[in-house]
UniProtKB/Swiss-Prot annotation:
Assembly: NDH-1 is composed of 14 different subunits. Subunits NuoB, C, D, E, F, and G constitute the peripheral sector of the complex.
The organism of origin for this protein: Leptothrix cholodnii (strain ATCC 51168 / LMG 8142 / SP-6)
PANTHER family referenced in this protein's UniProt entry, alphabetically: NADH DEHYDROGENASE [UBIQUINONE] IRON-SULFUR PROTEIN 2, MITOCHONDRIAL (PTHR11993:SF10), NADH-UBIQUINONE OXIDOREDUCTASE 49 KDA SUBUNIT (PTHR11993)
Class of the enzyme per the UniProt entry, highest EC level: translocase
Encoding gene (name): nuoD
UniProt cross-references to Gene3D superfamilies, sorted A to Z: Cytochrome-c3 Hydrogenase, chain B
Protein name: NADH-quinone oxidoreductase subunit D
Amino acid sequence: MAEIKNYTLNFGPQHPAAHGVLRLVLELDGEVIQRADPHIGLLHRGTEKLAESKTFIQSLPYMDRLDYVSMMCNEHAYCLAIEKLMGIQVPERAQYIRVMFSEITRLLNHLLWLGCHGMDCGAMNMLIYCFREREDLFDMYEAVSGARMHAAYFRPGGVYRDLPDVMPQYKVSKIRNAKAMARLNENRQGSLLDFIDDFTKRFPTLVDEYETLLTDNRIWKQRTVGIGVLTPERALNLGLTGAMIRGSGIAWDLRKTQPYDVYDRMDFDIPVGVNGDTYDRYLVRVEEMRQSNRIIEQCSAWLRANPGPVITDNHKVAPPSRVEMKTSMEELIHHFKLFTEGFHVPEGEAYAAVEHPKGEFGIYAISDGANKPYRLKIRAPGFAHLAALDEMSRGHMIADAVAIIGTMDIVFGEIDR
């Protein structure tokens, strides 16, 4: 009798559910996955090596381009590492702004994940619902930094500038008349904090809408319940973090276990799963969105009541204000030197990690006393998660591989670096 051979299938990198440039070599027995071999490196840009030839401040925009869905969270870890090396104290107001925008970034990430994960499994309408809310969040990014995605807003020692008193408004154009503009500008009449407060009031109801569409949906449950199960022990041994480990029932969240900035003052809960399957990870991330909304509300209330500086007064790191720079020759020279030569970081090494939307995102920086890092190592959560794909997908159907890739929430900017 002829020997039965397994069938090898190439999944991606052009596949619409590959989430970027994932190439999977699947070994199949009929339609059942026997082995999954992920091939990475198709988006490698040498970020860690590039950082060695750039000053510390010049490397900051590269961080936005790692996980290009969670921009400010990447910047946060990078700034924390430099601050740890230099012993810089960040003003309280800047810490609250950072925490607020880290949570806005978490919402941006989770909304894209929910829309794409739903669409991968056949719920086409989820993407439209989620992008409706992402538009408002991008407007918050644009108001503080001028960019909708790659913000480069955080700085070692604080943030680039304070929150604006006026929210940018839509203008009448060829494609939008005055009536449509008036409707879009209704909640943009005040400051950025007014706009954020309006969003946080509406958002819990909008999350309820998403849950109405998916949580008790019979087809959604058939696609996710019992798929990609990970026991707490295996999740720990595989080095998983974020929603991947919390979905398996382990309440590990750096915002609680190793709080940074002002997270120790925030009142929020850590959602955890029970079964460790794709459905539990979905529930964990949806509840995380509600908790992020709570944190944003608390930050907004504090920021209203407490004006103050938003960047350190250590002038070795912080540039002079625009007014000072345009009235004093010394300040102009200081500004020029700071942005051409950069600042020198004392010899040493530091590791800083943040609770990124995808897990523990860490920056390990080594300084030799120069104005550039001697070595910069990026700890990407998605890298460890992708390594677990083989174990999670064995014994499942090809169609389930799409649900498992979706539940990992992988982005190749950070994996390939």
